[in-house]
Amino acid sequence: MAHKKAGGSSRNGRDSAGKRLGIKAFGGQIVIPGNIIARQRGTTWHPGLNVGMGTDHTLFAKAEGRVEFRAKTGGRTFVSVIPVAEAAE
């Protein structure tokens, strides 16, 4: 005679892997064209000068320069790449 009731299968116990989202190049860092600046879902950060946005909202550099984050009115944060020659002046 069994002394334990039959155990039901658990409905928990699974999780998805992290998607490695976030800032990849921080403010002040030097980037080259094609470098990924941020991976995001939606537009947490918006593309500014010399920054493009991919179909999955990834922000990438279009020119060589220094990354700069700037908050604008309306609560939006724009990411720009300031060319090194301009930054030196």
UniProtKB/Swiss-Prot annotation:
Keywords: Ribonucleoprotein, Ribosomal protein. One of its GO terms (cellular component) is cytosolic large ribosomal subunit. It comes from the Bacteria. GO terms for molecular function: structural constituent of ribosome. GO terms for biological process: translation. The keyword Repeat does not apply. It holds the Pfam family Ribosomal_L27. Gene3D superfamilies: 2.40.50.100. PANTHER family: LARGE RIBOSOMAL SUBUNIT PROTEIN BL27M, RIBOSOMAL PROTEIN L27. HAMAP family: Ribosomal_bL27. Belongs to the bacterial ribosomal protein bL27 family. NCBIfam families: L27 (TIGR00062). This is Large ribosomal subunit protein bL27. It comes from Afipia carboxidovorans (strain ATCC 49405 / DSM 1227 / KCTC 32145 / OM5) (Oligotropha carboxidovorans). The gene is rpmA.
